[in-house]
Amino acid sequence: MANVFRTVIRIITCIALIICPMPTEKKCETEFNGTFIQSWMSSYWDDERWQDEISAMKEAGIKYLIIQDVAHKASDGTWTVYYNSNLDTFTNATFGAADVVEAALRNCEGSGIKVMVGLGLYDEWWTKSGFGKDYSELCNVSADMIEEIYNKYVSKYPDAFYGWYFTPEMSNGPLVKLSSPFIAKGVNVIIDAIERTD
């Protein structure tokens, strides 16, 4: 009896597939329209190189450019910063060859490409997650960066500036799960800073 039932179900399924074929057109198109750029790499670009890169991005259909981290804390505690910052945290920092934030915004202004500025990052993110003082410090420094970058560049390049990128991406590793309350606290510090700029 079970075999007869299975056979009937198979026949009904086949008839349904024949009578009600699946739609041939896609309901949505996948679209690749954004890209990342590293500050350390692009800090040596002049405006001509930026324009070449932006032309290539536009040709590829890019609408969004994400600058990865614009301030990086090495495991020895030193910072490298890729924009002209006056923050006390960066008093002894090494500065990149050029102000990547301004160069990206200036060259993308009027191009139709929107720029998201990556905040800070530190080397131990992948091994410490949200534990320890480094993550807390990073979130506080990133909040200060938001205020500084917003006040310094957004009114100059309103068509290019689009938002922020939280550089230490989350993963599903065990440390992230264990440190999620600390991660949430740090992200909230950054969200509060963003809300103050609106």
Q: Where on the chain are the PLM-derived regions?
A:
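Glycan-processing catalytic domains of CAZymes
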Residues: K27-D198
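Bacterial Sec-dependent signal peptides at the C-terminal "C-region" and cleavage site
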Residues: V8-E29
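N-terminal secretory signal peptides that target proteins for export/translocation
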Residues: M1-V4
